Amino acid sequence: MAKPVSETAVPLIRPEAAVARPKRAIPWEFWLLLPAVIYIFLLIGFPLILSIYYSLSHISVGRRDFSFAGLANFRAILHDGIFLQALRNTVLITIAVLVIVLILATILATILAARFRGRAVVRYLLLLPWAAPVVMSTIAWKWIFDSQYSVINWVLRQLHIIGPYEFPQWLGVPKLAIISIIMVQVWRILPFATVITLAGVNAVPKELLEAALVDGAGFFTRLFQITLPMIRPIIGVAVLFTALFTFTDMAVVWILTRGGPYNSSHVLASWAFQVGIVAGDLAQGAAIALFMLPVLAAVAVWVLRLASREVTE
């Protein structure tokens, strides 16, 4: 006997049930990245937001005035002669260090890429300035620049470049103080730039250089027409980090000269520390520090885009 139609009919499926899909769980990559994101935010993001907030207020150490000041702090520092001097010093020191470091790093990388006895020892000695703490090495340089017991003065006196009773004040004359800061920055950053450039030089195919050598290409032809064009993206990375390290460094200037004599050797980082922490004007100190942000961001974007274009081509 056949069943009634009502008992054999196929049950209706609701449209919501037909389109419903199982909920997608949070990907495991998210949980792996979360600690790093939180760490970076607490270390960089939160101080940056706090600096922006301070720079737009009237806050200082002795007065908790969080009232909105607009761009008054930025307008005030643009009319400050010491700030403009610090800005000129920062740009001058960064460009000088960049040029000297790139030239010396290319020469050292070319030498260290060749095989010779004692190459490992030379590479080890080259890395020592980078491994040493910046504060301790800068204190040692301060002794080297001492007006009476300076090793540099002794060498210059032995070479008869200066007289027996001349004592150049390396840290007491504005121009000599800037030269001293440049020397220490070059000594500090050169190992890092050399290692990066050396990695690029070693990555150049040996067959290409040997073919050029067979064709009669000399050393400088191979260097300027093969090696340097091929490692241009890596040189871009060295340029970026050298500029960032020099532009944002405060320790070398503060230990050597503390911005002296007469505030003539300040850079933006040391002047921001002087105004914001030593003098207690947190608002203007934050404004000076934030002045570096757009410059560094523009340099970083330009270098990274240049390097990316070179790799793509």
Give residue ranges: language-model regions.
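Short, Lys/Arg-rich, polar N-terminal cytosolic tail immediately upstream
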Residues: 1-25
